[in-house]
A protein has these predicted regions:
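Feature for intrinsically disordered/low-complexity regulatory segments and propeptides
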Residues: 1-141
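Intrinsic disorder/low-complexity polar-acidic segments
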Residues: 131-372
Length: 372
């Protein structure tokens, strides 16, 4: 039985209205440049305008050249900026010459800038003109518009990670708190986007568990969610409509996933280490991510309300391990995987969920001791 109440807080949070104000007041602009507009001075700044590159912006510039990333990294670490600038300028000039020789139209490069706290211009990304810009302020405003006026005023942003380019956070509002089996949860939405092409734009239902401050992103194939790449033409009216549908159904979807998640307590499993290692291999996790998952599961088993190995404990171990990551994007990746492990379908019932875990258990039993 899920009961609703409105007095649970999950860690640090801030009003949604504050975040909207911050995003709307940022100084950012875009330019369409040719190859000649990318020439560098000896400090690896843009000659035209004097902008400094962010690390990811400089990486996108270097991708236009044939220089191996290891070479670029070595020159940067050894403080060979003038030489590096010379190499890049020569490569860019070569590209411009090749276009002229082939009678191709001049390359149009979508160049993104923002100011830092001191007012200095930063070049943060370079794209082809196929890039579809939907920035964080636009996306968050669409989410806010999908709420009622009172929900918007009282909505709170949790676990915000924002560096001016990538934004990841969870959003809850009145009516999002849940009490299930004596444990406190919250349901809401997870928001993710990048203004420099490093992350998909996503708005998805989300579940948070108070006792361990873990999060889980609902990722069923049959559920409502927004997930788009910043490529081609994006119809902003259609995007806003899709977000309204997702936000409108988010609590119902999260409630359903919460029931499925808790049903996993009844799916008793034998060898948790083998199962976690098998799932790590299935989903191409790194060795370190799998080790953190094993540690997170051990911590989960020590909780007074858990104790036994089950589908619930294994999934919760994964969401616990996600909190160890220093990168919000990795945390989101692992929380999304946890959501997929809860159930592959929005309307899946207990027998289907148990059958899938039995298949995983069977595959895990065949792992060789060398792999373990």
């Amino acid at each position: 039985m899920i009961s609703t109440y409105d007095n649970v807080m999950f860690g640090d949070s801030r009003p949604l209205t504050d975040l909207l104000d911050q995003l709307s007041n940022e100084r950012k602009h875009d330019e369409i440049r040719s190859y000649s507009g990318l020439k560098l001075d000896d400090e690896c700044k843009l000659v035209d305008g004097g902008a400094t590159f962010t690390k990811r912006g400089f990486a996108s510039l270097c991708r236009l050249t044939s220089m191996p990333p290891a070479m670029v990294d070595w020159l940067c670490r050894k403080d060979y900026q003038p030489q590096l600038a010379g190499f890049i300028n020569a490569e860019i000039a070569g590209l411009q010459f090749d276009d002229g020789q082939a009678n191709r139209p001049g390359k149009r490069i979508f160049t993104r800038f923002r100011e830092d706290a001191k007012g200095n211009q930063l070049c943060r990304a370079l794209f082809s003109d196929r890039y579809a810009a939907v920035d964080a302020n636009v996306l968050v405003a669409m989410v806010a518009d999908a709420l009622t006026a009172s929900e918007r005023e009282q909505a709170r942003v949790h676990r915000l990670s924002y560096d001016g380019d990538e934004l990841l956070c969870n959003l809850v509002w009145p009516g999002c708190d849940r009490q299930v089996g004596g444990e406190a949860y919250q349901v809401g939405i997870a928001i993710q986007t990048s203004e420099i092409g490093t992350l998909r734009m996503q708005v998805q239902p989300w579940i948070g568990r108070l006792v361990c401050a873990n999060g889980l992103i609902v990722c069923t194939r049959t559920g409502e969610a927004v997930s788009k790449r910043h490529v081609g033409k994006i119809d902003l009216n259609q995007l806003a409509a899709d977000i309204r549908v997702t936000v409108g159904s988010a609590l119902a979807q999260a409630d359903r996933a919460l029931v499925q998640f808790l049903a996993g307590r009844k799916v008793k499993l034998a060898d948790s280490d083998r199962i976690i290692i098998q799932l790590g291999r299935d989903h191409r996790l790194t060795t370190e991510q799998t080790k953190r998952w094993l540690r997170g599961h051990e911590t989960t088993l020590s909780e007074p309300t858990v104790g036994e190995v089950s589908a619930f404990s294994i999934i919760n171990g994964l969401t616990r391990s996600a909190q160890e990551s220093e990168m919000a994007s990795e945390r989101t990746q692992l929380e999304s995987l946890a959501g997929r492990l809860v159930s592959g379908r929005f309307d899946a019932l207990y027998p289907e969920i148990e059958a899938e875990w039995r298949r995983v258990e069977t595959r895990a039993s065949m792992l060789s001791d060398e792999v373990l």
